[in-house]
């Protein structure tokens, strides 16, 4: 079948159902608005083809060549595109559900506002792709290649990025909740204003990383290295950082309510105006830290070391400080008796 013949069927409003077009030469075909059901395009040449606003259900594009194709506003359901070449495709507002992109190349593609649900992107390449406000919900992403991709405002929900290629990836306001990033070398990576709630970053090296205004609520960061990291105004409520190293990190105005810093090292870190009521930090090292105006009320600082730390006007209300070394305690605000009575009052 020629590209013109197939295009005429589409223009005539026919539902293209059950055709075997494996290996067909259909480059440049205009199939916009077509309805395709169970069509086999395996190995077909569809380079530069137009599928704008097309509906594709249960179709096979395995190893097909779709480089430069236009799939904008197309809807794909239960389609297989394993090993397909989709490099440079235009997928603006494209929707995909239960599709298999395993090993496919979407390098340099435009995925702006595209939405994919319950799809497989294992070993797929999105290198250099533009994925602004793109969403991958409940998709598998093992070994995905995101090098030099732009993920501004994108949402990858519960992504497996343990083996993802992230060199040069641009994250900005990206949702990566429950991401698997444990044990990785992420030195210098930037996650500005990203959502990493309950993400697993345990044991990862985030030395010099940019995490400003990043939401890390409940994130697992045990044993992570965050030396010199920028955590300005980051939200670390309930984050788990036992044994982590944050030497020289900037935590200015960071929110650490209920965070666990047991045995962590924060030598020379800046916690100016940090909000950390209920902080759990026994045996932590706050040596040479700037804790000016920090709120540590109710914190567990048992055997913590604040040697050479600055605590000017810091709030040390009702802290647990057994065995703690706090030489600049006089510069801080101690327990407020009236507040303590109010907090411990109970009806008789």
What feature does the model see in each segment?
Residues 1-348:
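Tandem repeat scaffolds
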């Amino acid at each position: 079948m020629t590209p013109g013949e197939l295009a005429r069927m589409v223009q005539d409003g026919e539902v293209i159902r059950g055709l075997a077009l494996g290996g067909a030469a259909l480059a440049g075909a205009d199939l916009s608005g077509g309805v395709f059901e169970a069509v086999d395009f395996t190995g077909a040449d569809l380079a530069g083809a137009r599928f704008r606003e097309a509906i594709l259900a249960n179709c096979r594009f395995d190893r097909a060549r779709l480089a430069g194709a236009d799939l904008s506003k197309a809807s794909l359901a239960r389609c297989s595109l394993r090993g397909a070449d989709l490099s440079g495709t235009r997928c603006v507002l494209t929707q995909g559900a239960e599709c298999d992109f395993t090993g496919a190349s979407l390098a340099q593609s435009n995925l702006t506002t595209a939405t994919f649900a319950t799809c497989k992107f294992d070993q797929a390449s999105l290198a250099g792709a533009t994925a602004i406000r793109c969403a991958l919900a409940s998709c598998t992403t093992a070994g995905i290649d995101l090098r030099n991709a732009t993920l501004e405002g994108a949402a990858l929900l519960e992504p497996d990025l343990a083996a993802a290629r992230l060199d040069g990836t641009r994250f900005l306001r990206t949702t990566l909740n429950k991401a698997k990033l444990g044990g990785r070398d992420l030195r210098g990576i930037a996650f500005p204003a990203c959502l990493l709630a309950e993400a697993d970053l345990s044991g990862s090296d985030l030395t010099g990383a940019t995490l400003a205004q990043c939401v890390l609520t409940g994130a697992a960061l045990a044993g992570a290295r965050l030396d010199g990291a920028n955590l300005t105004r980051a939200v670390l409520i309930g984050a788990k950082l036992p044994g982590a190293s944050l030497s020289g990190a900037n935590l200015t105005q960071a929110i650490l309510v209920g965070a666990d810093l047991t045995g962590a090292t924060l030598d020379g870190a800046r916690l100016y105006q940090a909000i950390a009521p209920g902080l759990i930090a026994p045996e932590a090292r706050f040596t040479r830290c700037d804790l000016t105006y920090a709120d540590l009320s109710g914190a567990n600082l048992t055997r913590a070391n604040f040697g050479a730390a600055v605590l000017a006007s810091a709030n040390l209300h009702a802290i647990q400080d057994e065995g703690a070394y706090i030489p600049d305690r006089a510069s801080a605000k101690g327990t407020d008796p009236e507040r303590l009575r109010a907090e411990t009052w109970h009806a008789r």
